[in-house]
A protein has these predicted regions:
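Accessory nucleic acid-recognition modules appended to NTPase machines
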Residues: 1-111
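Catalytic cores of nucleic-acid endonucleases
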Residues: 121-156
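Active-site ExK catalytic segment of metal-dependent nucleases
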Residues: 113-123
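Hydrophobic/aromatic beta-strand patches that form the interior of the parallel beta-sheet core
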Residues: 45, 94, 115-117, 144-146
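A short pocket-lining beta-strand/turn micro-motif at the edge of beta-sheets
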Residues: 102-104, 112-115, 139-142
């Protein structure tokens, strides 16, 4: 769905309404004014992938979907946020990206240290490393590659 043809204020208003109704939530980009980090970006996620699928009008089985990575990322992040809320863990949640497109899918900040999560639908693609600009700049408590095989450790 391309939103660039719509008035940005109208899009913002609708996203704000959906957020107030607990249909979607937004993650802000994490930045501490390092020159190459995105400072203003936000990502929108659905609390329920079924609503996401309905909006996109796509109920194709996962094995046939071209957006399985985005679905997996949306699923894990929404479940992790629900888990943290349920457990009383009020870590600040972000994503991180540089102008060179280096990215960490999801970050939790708690007591000045960070836990970084990278989502991979394919369990064979877990040889992911923390981008060096992040590793060199911030205290990293843990880096986790989340797959369908291990996600329950972080959501239940």
């Amino acid at each position: 769905m391309f939103l660039s043809c719509y008035d940005p204020k109208t899009v913002e208003k609708y996203i704000d309404l959906l957020e107030k109704c607990f249909v979607v939530f937004r993650l802000s980009a994490f930045s501490r004014n390092v020159r190459t980090e995105l400072k203003k970006g936000r990502k929108v996620f659905f609390y329920d992938n079924g609503i996401r699928n309905a909006v996109l009008q796509n109920f194709t089985p996962l094995a046939l979907r071209s957006d399985v990575g985005a679905l997996w990322e949306n699923f894990f992040i929404s479940e992790r946020i629900k888990y943290n809320h349920d457990k009383g863990n009020y870590a600040k949640s972000y994503f991180w990206r540089t102008t060179q497109q280096q990215e960490i899918d999801y970050i939790e900040e708690c007591d000045g240290a960070f836990t970084a999560f990278e989502m991979k639908w394919n369990p064979k693609k877990t040889s992911v490393t923390v981008p060096s600009p992040f590793k060199n700049e911030y205290p990293l408590r843990q880096f986790v590659v989340v797959t369908p095989e291990n996600y329950l450790e972080w959501t239940v």
